[in-house]
Amino acid sequence: MARLNITPLYSSLDNWPGRLFEAEGATIFNARTATSFVFTYPPGHDFAGFRVAVTGTGFAYSLGLPSAGSISSVVVRNGAGQPVLVFNSFTPNTLASDLSQFAASVFGGRDALGNGPGANGRGAWSILLSGNDVINCTNGNDRRSVEGLNSGNDRFNMLAGDDSVAGGIGNDTIFGGSGVDEISFEETSHNLGDSAFRGISVNMATGRLIDCWGGTDTFFDIERIIGSRFNDVFVGNAGRNDFSGLRGNDVFNGGGDQDRVRYGDDYWQGGRQGIVVDLETSNIGGVIRGAIRDGFGNRDVVINIERVNGTRYNDVFVGSSERNVFIGAEGRDSFNGMGSRDAISFDVSYTGVAQTGIIVNLQLAANQIVNDGFGNVETAISIEDIWASDQNDRLIMNGADNFVFGRDGADTMTGGGGRDTFSWEDEDEFGSGDRITDFVAVGTANLDRLGFDVEAFDNMTSTLRLVNGTSATTAAGVGQFVFNPLNDTLFWDENGSALGGSTAIVVLTNVAALSAANFDLF
């Protein structure tokens, strides 16, 4: 076994971490003793200036490279001398502690004519993590997984942050910690595909997962699962589940709450077509079954799934009798929410293409999405809610009770008829020049509301503090909403009557005053 301590520098590496253990070229040797073997990567290497220090016992050398020895630690430092990876606690007389085999992968065996095996960084990783290992991550976002086969019954301590673990061989135990954490088997479409032989079967309620090699993994505090290139089975729990199936004819059973299936990664794994979604082909006893053709042309079964992320291509979304949320992104998509209350979200680009502001008019009979931010005209039928982009959007809603989330950018929003709610969920969304053209502040029939996620804003609580006037009246440091009728603008003043801290939220055209009935603090 070995213990691997990953530092925050690992997730910020610019190049494939397999190259951390590939030493082809004019490698600089800093130490070759019976207990220490140290080398530095030369200019031109992906990790030029990085130093690998191996310590242990019984080190011997042949032609300048290790031929024997038992490893006790391997430390990788960057050019500034800061540790990136620290391996230690190796079990003696195992593959992982064999210096000769590790060095053979790191340096390869090519002669002067280029004949023989080259360096194999993936193989070196596989040797170091060939036992029952403990991998300790950081309190940051550890999105970069370890490399190699990573065989053995391993324990992953992911700690805080939004983390990602690559599923590997063995009966592993994964502690996600706080944050949004995932287990991914997408590497079965690449390096790990040669040894994998089956799809995963995961149950979020029991925290058990049969992996692609037949091992049984146990997990805690994991929120998202990414499947394999085979036929996968996903079973959710009572909370919100987040699944990606990738290739294969997959089965998704969401369970309770609002559950999501994502297809945006299909493109990166070779999927070259849009998805076709029908979330409700039958409804028997409250069990809602549907079908989705994925980005590879495979047919997935969905049970009690409410949210779907599409692809970069032209997707077709048909909803269910439950509340649905769809994300289409780059392609020319079509949306039909069917029953209940349904939303389209516009904050995703699957290929990194820059998005412009969206233009939506739900009062049109057809082509309600005039511009999806990528230049496409799209159909949106039976859609009540819009979650807009981070650009300058123009949104005209219909006669339903709509929910509008403008996000960043200077958004111009028209609620239309109905009791509409306009929402802000991040401080960055303030001060961007938002405007609501028809906000209804009085009356009972179509009274509109302004929604705020109080945890996202300094000094805001679920207790409303509001004044209609030109400045805050609360004590210093006590935040307050200020609606100034002289310019029709609502401000948030996080400092109260103290100087500074006032930021414009939205202009409410022709509104004289606001009251508690106009606010939803959640």
Can you say where each PLM-predicted feature lies in the sequence?
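Mature extracellular "passenger" or substrate-interacting domains of secreted, surface-exposed proteins
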Residues: P8-G131, G477-F481, D493-E494
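Acidic glycine/aspartate-rich repeat arrays in secreted/surface proteins
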Residues: S11-S62, G271, G352-A354, R419-F522
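Low-complexity acidic/polar repeat-biased segments
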Residues: G64-G114, T216, E223, R299, ...
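Extracellular, beta-strand-rich repeat scaffolds characterized by small/acidic residue-biased motifs
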Residues: S130-N132, N139-N141, G148-N153, A160-D162, ...
